[in-house]
C-alpha cells in the first residue's frame, strides 16, 4: 500500500506509536440521539424432515433392511387409498422466524396430516431426495397437498416406481394464506399387505421466506468514532480534532456504524476499535486517507485523489547531481484482494452473502505482490440480521460481539429516525432483492473508490474468484466481471534528484517539474531530505506523473 512520507511532527509520532492500540467505549457515550430503524432482511427458513417406519394395518408387515424405512399398508377396498407420508421434524432444521410458520406432527389428530402451518409467508419450496423400493403389487404416487380449512388441493403429484425420487416444487402464493397447511401423502391402489421402503435418504425440506419485526439499533457516526480514538491516543485529553470531508462519496456521507453489541441489544453495549482499523476501513472502503496538520492539531480524512493536484507548485531549474530513475516495484501488484473477511454463518442463507473477498489478477507477472483492500469493519447484511435475531435469546458471548458493522442510512425528518438506503440500486441474484441492503458496499464499489490508485499498475482487473455469492449483479453489472480502472494518479516510475534550490514548497499535493537531458519530468513528492548543517542540497524523491521529450 502506498504511503506518502509526511513531515515528521509530534502529532504524527503520537499516532504512529498508538495507532494499533484497541480502545473500548460505551456505545451510550458515542451514539446518535436518534436510532436506526432496522426493518429487517427477508431470509430463508428450512424445515428438515425424516421418514420413519409406519404400519397402516398390514397383517404381514415387512421388516426394514439396512438403512431402510418401511411403510406397510393394507388396502382391501376398491379404488385408491390415501395414507399420510410419515415425516418427523429434524433437529437440523434452520428456523429463524417461527412466527410465520408452525412445524406440525403430521399424525396428530386435527392436523389433517400436515407437516407445517403458515401464518404469513411469501414463498415456499418443497424438496426431496431419496431412494424408494416397492412390493410387487404396490402402485403408488406421492402428493404434495395444500390444506385450507376443509378444502384440500393437490399441488404436485409424483408418480414413481422403484428408484430415486428427486423432486422440488414451489407452492403458489394462493395457497399460503394465514392458516394454510401443507401435507404430504401417498396414494395406492387395491392390494393386500403391500409396502414401500425408503433408503439412501438425503433430504426432505420445506423452505419458506420470512421477515421479522423491525427493531431500533443504536448507531455511531464515523467522525464521532474518529474523534474518540484521537482523544484516547492523546491520553484522554482534548486538543486533537478529527474531520472527514463530506460531499465526495455519498456512501460515506450516509454511513452509520453499528457496534455488534448494539445489534444484539446487550445492556451497556461497547464498541471496540483501534485507529489502524478505522484508517484501514476508510482507505479500503472509500479510498479516504488521513492528512495530519500538526500546527492545528488536526487529522483530516479526504479522498486520496485530492492529494494529487495536477498544478505545478515548483519548477526545479537546476539539477545539480544524483539524478536517477527507476521503477518502484513496491507499486506493482500481481493480485488485488478486495472486500471483507469471510464469515461462516452455518446457514442456508450464507451462500447468498456477497460482501466477502473478491480476488482479481492484474496481468503483471514481474512480482508476486498482493494489494489487500480488506475492510476490518463489516458490511454483510446477513451478519447484521443474525445478530439482531439473537436479541433476548441468550447472554453468552458471541465471536462477532467485538465486530463493527456499518450501513448506509439517511435520517428521516418525518419519522425522526435513520432508515436504510435501498433506493437507487437494482440488485439481482440474491434471495430477496427488495429487502437487501448495503449493496453499495460491494467489493466492486470498493475498487471504484480506489480506482485511480489501482490504475497506477493495472488498467484492467480480471476477476478470478470470490469467497461469497458471485452471481450477484448491481444495476445490471455483474460482480464477477472484469473491471477497468481509472486514469492513474501517477506512474510506477520513481525519480531521485538533488538540487541546490533550498526553497521547498509548502504544498506537497502539487507537481514538481524539471528538465534533464532532453526530457521534461513532472511528479509528486514522495520524500525530501534536507540537511541544513551541511551544504549538500535538497534531495527529492518523486513519483513520476509524466515524462516527455523536449523538442
Residue spans of the language-model regions?
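Surface-exposed cap/loop segments at beta↔alpha junctions
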Residues: 1-88, 167, 175-240, 538-551
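Short beta-strands within extracellular/lumenal beta-sheet-rich domains
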Residues: 78-119, 166-168
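Extracellular beta-strand-rich recognition modules
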Residues: 116-140, 167-170, 177-190
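Short, surface-exposed beta-strand/strand-loop-strand elements in extracellular ectodomains
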Residues: 139-151
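Trp-centered recognition loops
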Residues: 162-169, 275-276
